[in-house]
């Protein structure tokens, strides 16, 4: 996609949350080739939770992930956060909702919204296909959402 940076199309984005609920972007060194590699150094931050750091990893906006490896320092714990029981915000739209032209996955407006609201977001943005199809709206009606956002 010549109009988007490789970090948006194929990259990942990592954010951490402090004990006050404030989220911060974690800068990384990255390499793009046959394999995309991100290296994060010194991911210790002030004001952490009692149990350590909490991170959110945003996956590529356009390219799929066939394999993902996450390494942690020896002696560290790695646990997944339990899925939220809160009803999600469901977003239906076109390429802009999908994340087109965002510089990084975390900068797609849907992911910014998720961080600002601190609630789950289901992103149903499809490049070239946000056509307000009746059948799709019937499927949307089956989702128990806190709110629907239609961006077409």
Tell where the protein language model's regions lie, with residue ranges.
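N-terminal secretory targeting modules
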Residues: 1-88
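Serine-esterase "nucleophile elbow" of acetyl-processing enzymes
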Residues: 48, 55, 59-142
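Short acidic/histidine-rich motifs immediately flanking catalytic phosphotransfer sites
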Residues: 143-147
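Structural motif
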Residues: 149-151
């Amino acid at each position: 996609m010549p109009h988007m940076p490789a970090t948006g199309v194929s990259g990942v984005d990592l954010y951490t949350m402090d004990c006050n609920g404030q989220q911060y972007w974690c800068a990384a060194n990255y390499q793009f080739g046959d394999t995309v590699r991100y290296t994060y150094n010194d991911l210790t931050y002030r004001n952490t939770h009692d149990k350590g750091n909490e991170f959110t990893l945003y996956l590529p906006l356009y390219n799929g992930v066939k394999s993902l490896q996450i390494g942690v320092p020896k002696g560290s714990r790695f646990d997944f956060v339990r899925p939220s029981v809160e009803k999600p915000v469901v977003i239906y739209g076109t390429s802009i909702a999908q994340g087109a032209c965002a510089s990084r996955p975390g900068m797609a407006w849907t992911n910014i919204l998720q961080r600002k609201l601190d609630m789950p977001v289901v992103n149903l943005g499809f490049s070239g296909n946000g056509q307000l199809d009746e059948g799709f709206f019937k499927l949307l009606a089956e989702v128990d959402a806190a709110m629907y956002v239609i961006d077409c």
